[in-house]
Each structure stands twice: as C-alpha cells, then as structure tokens.
C-alpha cells in the first residue's frame, strides 16, 4: 500500500532576525510533525506568511506577500508582528485562514492542523536536535529574550511583542551548545534589548553543567564565550554595564563587535525620541572602549528627519559621527508608525529634507568607513567563509555581521570550505569591503 504524501507548506519569513528565529521555531515544529516544506506557493497545501509590522513600508511588503500567497495558493495563515493588529490584513484579505501575532507558535500550529492535518510517519518525525534553521549551517541567530521595557517614542515593538521576557541562562546555553555541536561557527546574539537581558528575572540563577549561571548580560556573554564559537552581540542598548563586556573582547571570549542602536546624537532629538541623551559621555565611553580593545568594531543605526530635527541637530549628528568613527552604519528616514507617540510631535520634516539629510549622512559614513578600512591594509585578519566563487571566496571579518555589514573577498591557492575560518592578509580596501589573500600559501 502506497504511503500517503506528506502535506506541504510554503513559508515566507519577513522582517528582522528575531522574526527569522520565530520562523525557525514554527518550521521545526512542523517538520517534527511530518510536514514538508514546498519551494513554491502553488505546489503547497497552504502558505504561512510571517509578517513585519514595524514600519508602514514593512506593512506594505507584508501585505504584498500575503496577496501573492493568496493569488498563487488561496490557503494562507498569517502570523508575526503585523498580525498583532489584524484589522488591516482582514480588510485587505478577508479570506485568510488565520491571523496571529508574534511568538504565537501554538496558534499557528493549531491553524495548520485545522487546514491540513498532519500524517504521522515515524520516518518523517526526525528533526535535528538543534531544530530547523533558515540560515547557512555555519552561523545561527540565538534569541535570548522577547519584548522590550523601553518606550521610545517612535517604536511600537512593546505593543507588538510585549515587555521584556528573558529566557533562563541555562536554556540559552543549552541551545547554543547544541548549535555549536551541529557545526555552527558563529552565534549571533539577538533580542529587542540584549543588554537588558535578565532584568525581568531579577538575574535569577539556573543550573548549567557543574555550576549556576545568572541571567545577566555579562554572565551570559562570558559563558557563551567558552563554547568555542564566534559570539557576536547585537541590539545592545548602551547601559553603563555594557562597559564590562569590553574585557571579554580583549580576552578573545566574544568578538570585538558591538551593535548599538544610538538612533541620533543631538540631545534635543534624543529627548524627543525618549532615548538616553548623554551622547557626550557616549563619546568618552567609545574612546575608552577602543583604548581597551583597539580592534573593536561599532555598528549602529540612526534615524534622520525625526519630528523636530533641525538642521543644527543634523549637523551635530554629522560632527558626532566624525568623532565617534562608527564602523558600520544603517540609516533610516523617519516614517510615522501607527500607534507611535512620535506621530503627535510638532515639527514634522518634509520628505525632500529627509532624503537630502539621508544622502549627506550616508556620504559622510562612506568616507568614515573607507578611512577605517584603509587602516587594515597590510594586516592579517581572521575571516569566516560564506560563499565560494569560481575565482574568489566571499567571507567576513570579526568586524562584519552577515547580511548587514561588509564582506572580505579572498583568493587562495588551496580549496576553501564554507564555514571555514582562515587567516588572510588584507591587500586593499574600498569604501565598505576588503580584499585579500589567504595567508600561508
């Protein structure tokens, strides 16, 4: 008797790495129940769309993805941040099977079961212990908490994902250890507010191996640094205790890399954003960090054209960047977000001014990046290989996160492998990328 075909699901994952982790968890559960993944909507039994709802542009992308799934398949389950406020989805696509908010894994699975029940097959119920991942095998996102306790005026993340909810240190470390055992060479630590990790748990201890570990930013970073993989810290809010992690970087326990979303530099704009406004002290801290760890790379994001931002505020930001010398920068033109307090602020900046300031900011940052990368010419850097091409390999240095930062293009006399970490001599630099040769050959 022929075995019935396993039900197939097509999956669309939109938004940030935190949403990608949500997608991985849903897919892991589905694969454990015997569902298969389809590459095309029209060949699937149903489609799941994990949406982003942070900016209006992201909502439009999510709606477009839902529309494509409805047109190609017709059976669509919607989840993710945009699903936390379902009215817009319901109005545009009343025929979707289910709409849920972020992290509602059980609700998504219930909707799948109703639409297409699983076929139990013990030969299919095999899932790697570390779960299903959507990233390449050599790196993985490690989500340590959900939600956020901050109330920045431009942000609705707490409304979508709730207040801070940290995982226990032991739970995080168990997942990290499984990932490393499965061949992961780089752990990218993510959350909405990584440096606030454990505040909600009152830094409670949990048993890990022969000891107890506190649910605290520095303690978790120290333990992750013992697993033998690169550890990269993202979304680090600049609380004073962040200074402590620089020592782990100088010891080689975690990568000399900090992703800190400063958002602006002008004290007046930061006050309107409800962000820490002591950026003069931040410059002093950056200088101390780099004195302690000269290889430190800083990534940040900034918003231009925020309501109330004057030309003087913007010039202040440019001057601050020149002094801070941020290595990697992402910039956004301010967009009103439904439900954000910043919508009610006076002094809305015209779109053409936003665009002009964004252009100037990116030009300034390009010059800073080129200047800093030029200093690396002639040095030797450790590079993790991401892709192998016909003549060159593409990788990243310790200063580069996947997808968002620069690349290092390498030539080598010997074959290289994806995920391999090699030492390379840097031969030249351009504005955002490095070029070099694998050392020793």
From Swiss-Prot:
Main EC class the enzyme belongs to: transferase
GO terms of biological process kind: tRNA modification
Matching HAMAP family: MTTase_RimO (MF_01865)
Annotated ranges, domain Radical SAM core: 134-371
Record's protein name: Ribosomal protein uS12 methylthiotransferase RimO
Binding-site list for [4Fe-4S] cluster 2: 148, 152, 155
Binding site for [4Fe-4S] cluster 1: 16, 52, 81
Membrane-spanning parts: none
Record Gene3D superfamilies: Methylthiotransferase, N-terminal domain, Nucleic acid-binding proteins, tm_1862 like domain
Reactions it catalyzes: L-aspartate(89)-[ribosomal protein uS12]-hydrogen + (sulfur carrier)-SH + AH2 + 2 S-adenosyl-L-methionine = 3-methylsulfanyl-L-aspartate(89)-[ribosomal protein uS12]-hydrogen + (sulfur carrier)-H + 5'-deoxyadenosine + L-methionine + A + S-adenosyl-L-homocysteine + 2 H(+)
Keyword Iron-sulfur: yes
GO CC list: cytosol
Keyword list, A-Z: 4Fe-4S, Cytoplasm, Iron, Iron-sulfur, Metal-binding, S-adenosyl-L-methionine, Transferase
Family from the record: Belongs to the methylthiotransferase family. RimO subfamily.
SMART domains registered for this protein in UniProt: Elp3 (SM00729)
SUPFAM superfamilies: Radical SAM enzymes
PROSITE patterns: MTTASE_N, MTTASE_RADICAL, RADICAL_SAM, TRAM
Cofactor: [4Fe-4S] cluster
Protein species of origin: Rhodopseudomonas palustris (strain HaA2)
Domain MTTase N-terminal residues, every copy: 7-117
Enzyme Commission number, as recorded: 2.8.4.4
Cofactor note: Binds 2 [4Fe-4S] clusters. One cluster is coordinated with 3 cysteines and an exchangeable S-adenosyl-L-methionine.
Taxonomic classification: Bacteria, Pseudomonadati, Pseudomonadota, Alphaproteobacteria, Hyphomicrobiales
A Gene Ontology molecular function term of the record: metal ion binding
């Amino acid at each position: 008797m022929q075995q019935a075909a396993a039900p197939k699901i097509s999956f669309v994952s939109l938004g940030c790495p935190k949403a990608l982790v949500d997608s991985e968890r849903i897919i892991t559960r589905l694969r454990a129940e015997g569902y298969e993944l389809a590459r095309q909507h029209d060949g699937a039994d149903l489609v799941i769309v994990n949406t982003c709802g942070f900016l209006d542009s992201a909502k439009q992308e999510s709606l477009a993805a839902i529309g494509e799934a409805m047109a190609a398949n017709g059976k669509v389950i919607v989840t993710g941040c945009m699903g936390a406020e379902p009215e817009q989805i319901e109005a545009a696509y009343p025929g979707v099977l289910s709409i849920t908010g972020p992290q509602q894994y059980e609700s998504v699975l219930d909707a799948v079961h109703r639409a297409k029940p699983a076929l139990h097959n013990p030969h299919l119920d095999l899932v790697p212990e570390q779960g299903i991942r959507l990233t390449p095998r050599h790196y993985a996102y490690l989500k340590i908490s959900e939600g956020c306790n901050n109330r920045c005026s431009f942000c609705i993340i707490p409304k979508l994902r709730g207040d801070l909810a940290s995982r226990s240190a032991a739970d995080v470390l168990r997942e990290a250890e499984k990932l490393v055992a499965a061949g992961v060479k780089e752990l990218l630590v993510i959350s909405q507010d990584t440096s606030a990790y454990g505040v909600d748990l009152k830094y409670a201890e949990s048993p890990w191996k022969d000891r107890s570990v506190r649910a605290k930013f520095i303690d978790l970073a120290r333990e992750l640094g013992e697993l033998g993989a690169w550890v990269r810290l993202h979304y680090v809010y600049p609380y004073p205790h962040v200074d402590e992690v620089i020592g782990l970087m100088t010891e080689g326990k975690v990568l000399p890399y900090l992703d800190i979303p400063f958002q602006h530099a002008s004290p007046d704009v930061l006050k309107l954003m409800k962000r820490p406004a002591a950026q003069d002290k931040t410059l002093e801290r950056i200088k101390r960090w780099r004195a302690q760890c000269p290889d430190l790379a800083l990534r940040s994001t900034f918003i231009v054209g925020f309501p109330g931002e004057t030309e003087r505020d913007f010039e202040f930001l440019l001057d601050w960047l020149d002094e801070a010398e941020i290595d990697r920068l992402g910039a956004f033109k301010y967009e009103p977000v439904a439900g954000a307090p910043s919508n009610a602020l006076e002094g809305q900046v015209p779109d053409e001014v936003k665009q002009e300031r964004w252009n100037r900011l990116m030009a300034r940052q390009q010059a800073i990046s080129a200047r800093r990368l030029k200093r690396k010419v002639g040095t030797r850097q450790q590079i993790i290989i991401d892709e192998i091409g016909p003549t060159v390999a593409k990788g990243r240095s310790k200063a580069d996160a996947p997808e968002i930062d620069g690349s290092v293009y390498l030539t080598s006399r010997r074959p290289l492998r994806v995920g391999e970490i090699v030492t390379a001599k840097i031969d030249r630099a351009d504005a955002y990328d490095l070029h070099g040769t694998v050392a020793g050959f």
